[in-house]
């Protein structure tokens, strides 16, 4: 897995999605790569323990909102995400945010076209969570 060129993978996937080269700034594989979005939290991409991880931080909802949204959140969490090592997205909570996270299977991190599909599917999950919250 250490042979992954994360910068090139992300760059290729962004070109595949249709991002103009002029808006893709210098990418650095020594820290998380952040894809800023207009109306959603940023998508972060990094190598963690030699595995590609994607995550997005949402503002932490109140306990009441979280409880009232539990059914919809559970449905989101149980949706198949076939690119993930456990075929699911994960949700982690802190005082400051809810983090939607996925660790990608090694088979899918060598092709920009496939990684573009992963980014798109992850973004769709972000949209669902954003609507629920």
From Swiss-Prot:
- Show the disulfide pairing: none
Q: Which residues form the signal peptide?
A: none
Keyword Ribonucleoprotein on entry: no
Q: Does the keyword Chaperone apply?
A: yes
Gene3D superfamilies in alphabetical order: 3.30.1460.10
**Record's subunit section:** Homodimer.
As for family, the record states: Belongs to the SpaK family.
Q: What is this protein called?
A: Surface presentation of antigens protein SpaK
């Amino acid at each position: 897995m250490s042979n992954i060129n994360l910068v090139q993978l992300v760059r290729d996937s962004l070109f595949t999605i249709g991002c103009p080269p002029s808006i893709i700034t210098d990418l650095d594989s020594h820290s998380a790569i952040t894809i800023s979005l207009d109306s959603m939290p940023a998508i972060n991409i990094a190598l963690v323990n030699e595995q590609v991880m994607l995550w997005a931080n949402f503002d932490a909802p109140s306990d009441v909102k979280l409880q009232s949204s539990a059914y919809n959140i559970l449905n989101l969490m149980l949706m198949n995400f076939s690119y993930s090592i456990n075929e699911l997205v994960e949700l982690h909570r802190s005082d400051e945010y809810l983090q939607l996270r996925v660790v990608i299977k090694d088979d899918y991190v060598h092709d920009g076209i496939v990684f573009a599909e992963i980014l798109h599917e992850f973004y769709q999950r972000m949209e669902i969570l954003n609507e629920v919250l």
